[in-house]
């Protein structure tokens, strides 16, 4: 990878540290072939495993990792976004891109060793008039009532940006 960006780190219920980041293949830009990566440490960060590829969608952009650990169940939720690698932020916001930015999740029930396949959440978290959506940066939190509060930004009707957080 040429560049690593948008880091996020959480501690699993077994004490493992999980560090997520985008792996940008062609350069520092925010579009293109971008994969989602994970490195784990089981010794408090003294050593780290080799990067684990969590999501490679070919030439497309997979990123904005936003993890949260449910301390009650131990499940780790990873929220993220995906768009065509040929679509750029300004085009997505202006609705001149080929596709829109979409929202996805993956989960792990074994402290980040293995992960579910990506599952799309766009319809439940992104309003129809929102053109842009980005999870994070950083991590989310679990409220006492079990709600996962995920930081995110969006642009609505190609004019304004707002902050939003929601995920059940």
Predicted features and spans:
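Asp-box/BNR beta-propeller blade signature and adjacent active/binding-site loops
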Residues: 1-168
